[in-house]
Amino acid sequence: MWVFGYGSLIWKVDFPYQDKLVGYITNYSRRFWQGSTDHRGVPGKPGRVVTLVEDPGGSVWGVAYKLPVGKEEEVKTYLDFREKGGYRTTTVIFYPKDSTTKPFSVLLYIGTCDNPNYLGPAPLEDIAEQIFNAAGPSGRNTEYLFELADSVRKLVPEDADEHLFSLEKLVKERLEGK
């Protein structure tokens, strides 16, 4: 079983895996539209973390992890708990960056618009302000944003995730202005 990471699963890998590959999935875009009251915010003052939204023609780069044989259910149970804040699972096709490896199915955690923590779209400036001000049990929301942006930039320098990098720029401007 393979699991696709497009948010904190890219840079905070706290579960065992057998192999990992950089690549992308299609027909989605990454957006900071999911609220976090359990990791990067608190009830009443949620942080914002990424989810995926359907986007015909879109693509999202990330990392696929092969779960260890015999431990798939154990690791999936852990990931179900870690991604408990309104995420459900689905299966999609993953396209490895290394084109000599054929595409294959991966498990995907996605926060849909009908979950209680879904915040949805907002002006980028408002999302940046919310990220700038939020913190929770797993740390500041700014750390989540910066770790994700740095990781995507290192893994896939050619990825021009405008939403991610625009938010990074806006939040850094707020930090410098403080």
UniProtKB/Swiss-Prot annotation:
Into which EC class is this enzyme placed? lyase
Where is the protein situated, by its record's location annotation? Cytoplasm, Cytosol
Gene Ontology annotations for the cellular component aspect, listed alphabetically: cytosol
Positions with a binding annotation for substrate: V3, F4, G5, Y6, G7, S8
Catalyzed chemical reaction(s): glutathione = L-cysteinylglycine + 5-oxo-L-proline
GO terms, molecular function = glutathione specific gamma-glutamylcyclotransferase activity
A single Gene Ontology biological process assigned to it is: glutathione catabolic process
Active-site feature positions: E83
List keywords of the entry alphabetically. Cytoplasm, Lyase
Q: Is Chloroplast one of the keywords?
A: no
Q: What highest taxon heads this organism's lineage?
A: Eukaryota
EC number of the protein: 4.3.2.7
Describe the subunit structure: Monomer.
Which family does the record claim for this protein? Belongs to the gamma-glutamylcyclotransferase family. ChaC subfamily.
**What is the name listed in the Swiss-Prot or TrEMBL entry for this protein?**
Putative glutathione-specific gamma-glutamylcyclotransferase 2
Q: Which organism does this sequence originate in?
A: Mus musculus
